[in-house]
Amino acid sequence: MVAPRALIVLLGLALSGAGAGAAAGAECVALEDFSLGSVGEFPPDWKPRKEEGRSVYSIQEEGGLRFLRAAATRLGVQAGREVAWNLEAYPILAWSWRPIEFPKGSDERKSSTNDSAVSVYAVFPHTPVSVKSVKYIWSRVVPVGTHLTSSAGNTQVRVLRTGPDKVGQWVEEQVNVREDYRKYFGGSDVPRPAGIAVLTDSDDTKSTARGDYAGFRVCKP
């Protein structure tokens, strides 16, 4: 799936008054810790781009940590949560993720193999029927720092990590969403974010992808 997926989770992610939740640290505010909902179920307040996504994503728990597990076989369905925050005060988006199984033969540089074990989107309003987004991926083979585009430029992709060396291990990420938006889309004005989304997909490679996500929060510089 190329064009439909690149259009990224419309999900009703229009700009809203939904704000961030409880503090997750002295300089951070929690967006999602998956503490709501039941283990084994699709998370409340999230929406799949297609209904079949409800079978891909589920809340799990290990050692007291709640997280979102994704397991996709020949599927490419995003899930997202509508949540806005003050980007001027909190430009840093942080989360933890771990790849469990990379899609066989995946390479995000090619439309025929454009699948990822784990990827995270910062979503911004664009038009009444479309969004812009910065997508962060953990690729199987594409070098760290590679910049890719899709959806006629409305999705800008940044490779944060590459390779299987840390398969099964939680890794913490922090990205400056405000700076990345300005870098990739240009201009000094950055719209208020509309939400976050994730995608674990394997439809292009006709294989299986698995990965986990946890602890989404926004932080001061």
What kind of region is each of these model predictions?
Residues 55-78:
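Short carbohydrate-recognition loop motifs
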Residues 100-169, 209-212:
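Extracellular ligand-binding interfaces
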Residues 34, 196, 214-218:
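Extracellular beta-strand elements of beta-rich domains used
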Residues 115-120, 157, 163, 167-210:
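Extracellular beta-strand ligand-recognition surfaces/modules
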Residues 90-100, 104, 196-200:
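A short beta-strand element within beta-rich, extracytoplasmic domains
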Residues 24-50:
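Extracellular carbohydrate-recognition regions
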Residues 6-18:
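Bacterial N-terminal signal peptides
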Residues 82-93, 164-167, 189:
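Extracellular/lumenal carbohydrate-interaction signature centered on repeated Trp-anchored short motifs
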